[in-house]
């Protein structure tokens, strides 16, 4: 049984750096490159939580800036292994918001090219070693303990993270719960899924005929400020599917995670709106008021899927960075490029100027045991029974 522990985030305390981040958080020294710029001179204003879903085409990247200026970049991907286009787009955008090239945290949701890029060429590597970004802490999943159909990108990142070159990023394995990310300004941040929360067997299964897809190991996280709840989960899978011909298998981790997340206001849609994610159980538990899809025009995967769009617009306002699959009817969805959430009080918030009000109740730890009531072992079971969506893959998965 797994429970979420959420505590108020406090001011960042990270290694010393060439210059302070906008809110006083510190990023690491020893990063290649100069000219980091003056933090706080960008578009972000003190007192505001901003979450920027950057339109970088096929590459996914999200920038979080807390009311006190601590920053976190979630992913920075590329469309191809030999590309640095995504990194250049992300780097310029981040500088425009922060006014500098200092990041308190970088979070890698999982090791797919479109989320992290290829070391030595693009993505996060390019931001640090070519653009001179300084990073206080790099958080990632345990790719040495859990490995499936990750391919060359996973292998390259494993090698890179073991090199002296990666020390500049201060890498650290993410763990369930709160504490590793301290954004300050009344913002709480907790990991709700890391390496499938033990639902998948540990080991390196890369040589198997249909090992767990890298998406299955995606890191999921819940950010909270006041009444505003925001959920992001990389490309977390929402169905069980074994494809020997494709050389991978998906496992329904969304259903297992849903009970830990409960209601949210804003959902960064997993896997670009794929039909393999955002399942009925997850959406029924979360009931998002706003859903955001980061997707590229011209993608060859059919993202976003019509079925997923239909599920999302049934309960939420939908925003997309690009249209994606031209045959998908977006219904009431809006294509807006960069999708930006802003709030100063954790209640009233805007998405690209459209106004919303956070409707979740303020989460209260009524008995003082460190757990919010939604996942309090004294009051409510957080056990999630996986929906047998296509069955359970007993080869790798813990089945009921």
Residue ranges of predicted features:
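Ser/Thr-rich, Pro/Gly/Ala-heavy low-complexity intrinsically disordered linkers and tails
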Residues: 1-2, 6-38
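Conserved Rossmann-like nucleotide-binding pocket used by diverse enzymes
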Residues: 9, 107, 373
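Flexible, acidic/histidine-containing loops and adjacent segments that form or flank the divalent-metal
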Residues: 35-50, 56, 93, 116-252, ...
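Active-site-proximal loop/helix segments of hydrolase catalytic cores
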Residues: 53-99, 107-130, 195-304
